[in-house]
Amino acid sequence: MDVLCHPREEYGRRRLVRFMVIGGTFRDVAVRPASTRDIDVVLIDRKEIDPEAMAAEGFTRVAGSPHAWRYTSEGRTVDVEIAAVASSSEPAGPFSAAFKHGETRLVEGLRVSVPRIEDYVVLKLLAAAANRRRRARDLADVQGALEAFPERAATSLSIAGVRARLRDVYAVQGQRLKTLVALFRQVPRPARG
């Protein structure tokens, strides 16, 4: 991840790669520790990472995946996968909205952009609706977020709060909004203490 945060200078100019960490790495930091071998990132205002910069830092392309890079050191391997692209200036797309409202967290000693927990939940609901095969896993991640942030259960992570965020921030309407809220209702809530 350091290559993304601190790329080498080229021709006297710093090559800045803006990105947001999502997926398992975000879950491990913000929700609950688990094991992940990959780092899912959303590139901001660019479609790809400079292949020469990645190679210079010791990364190789993952065979069969044009958007994934592998790094191996001291017997450990990690893959950096570009999960999506987003814009910092255009509101279109869920990852652009999540980035716009994101925050900064310390991940492996580096300050990186991450989605707010409410946006993580929304992104997981969108993923669950889009892919039935991964639905149970995505909804389990939503449940983990609810358990990790019980103080938000009556506000931003309530059914009304998530519905409002889907509608107002992500511009989800009609039947799609009803479907996503129905998925959210399926997620078990933590017991109130």
Residue ranges and their predicted role:
Residues 1-193:
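Compositionally biased terminal segments of proteins
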